[in-house]
């Protein structure tokens, strides 16, 4: 749910282990998020924490902005710690909201969104990793679209306090899904590009691989989130 400096990572020269490091940390982050969410559900703590879901949301934004602003000054262990903190906070966010969706729409909606997100992310990342087309221009368009999505979402949040507009929200969810699928493709191509470059194993290269792991983590999380909204909306209209 955070935004990262993607252009900063695209032109860096990194060692050959960069790609496996990125996806390894992304997977670790997702595992931490899943375990945190499951822990809240198993203990029933999500009921008490549900009113504070917005705190976890803003906390993830704060961590992501801090990493982006302080990446040059932070040590590798510090970035690792912040990455894990981000993953835990996302687990707190989803751990308080997903059980509510499951109770209202059924667990099948959650599992359908989870499985679909995994398939869509995998196919998108594979295409980005193996396509020979230059996606640089598409990346710039997607970043502008992402800014527009944030503005539209904030405007919708304000207007919806007075007038419910479920169809407009559904359109926003589809737009968000398209944007993050596209970002997955271009980020995967960026990972492949820098992975082919030859560089040392210094701290900067490791920190940059963690940043790109966060980017891919954010992509798959947001794909899941928008799919969950879409599936829940479809179930509600039946």
UniProtKB/Swiss-Prot annotation:
GO MF annotation list: calcium channel activity
Organism in which the protein naturally occurs: Chlamydia trachomatis serovar D (strain ATCC VR-885 / DSM 19411 / UW-3/Cx)
UniProt subcellular location: Cell membrane
Sorted UniProt keywords: Cell membrane, Membrane, Transmembrane, Transmembrane helix
Family of the protein in this entry: Belongs to the BI1 family.
Protein name as annotated: Uncharacterized protein CT_819
Topological category with respect to the lipid bilayer: Multi-pass membrane protein
Cellular-component GO terms for this entry: plasma membrane
One of the GO biological process terms: regulation of proteolysis
Membrane-spanning intervals of the chain: 22-42, 49-69, 78-98, 105-125, 141-161, 166-186, 208-228
């Amino acid at each position: 749910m955070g935004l990262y400096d993607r252009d900063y990572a695209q032109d860096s020269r990194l060692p050959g282990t960069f790609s496996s490091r990125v996806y390894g940390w992304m997977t670790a982050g997702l595992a931490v998020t899943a375990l945190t969410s499951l822990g809240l559900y198993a203990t029933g703590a999500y009921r008490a924490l549900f009113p504070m879901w917005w705190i976890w949301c803003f906390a993830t934004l704060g961590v992501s902005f801090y990493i982006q602003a302080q990446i040059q000054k932070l040590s590798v262990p510090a970035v690792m710690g912040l990455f894990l903190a981000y993953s835990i906070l996302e687990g707190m966010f989803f751990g308080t909201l997903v059980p509510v969706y499951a109770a209202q729409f059924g667990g099948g909606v959650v599992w359908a969104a989870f499985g679909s997100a995994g398939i869509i992310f995998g196919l998108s990342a594979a295409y980005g990793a193996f396509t020979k087309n230059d996606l640089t221009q598409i990346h710039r368009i997607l970043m502008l679209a992402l800014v527009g999505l944030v503005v539209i979402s904030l405007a919708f949040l304000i207007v919806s306090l007075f007038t419910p507009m479920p169809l407009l929200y559904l359109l926003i969810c589809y737009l968000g899904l398209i944007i993050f699928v596209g970002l997955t493709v271009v980020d995967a191509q960026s990972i492949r590009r820098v992975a082919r470059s030859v560089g040392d194993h210094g701290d900067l290269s490791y920190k940059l691989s963690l940043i790109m792991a966060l980017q891919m983590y954010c992509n798959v999380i947001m794909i899941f989130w928008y799919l969950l909204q879409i599936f829940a909306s479809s179930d509600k209209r039946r």
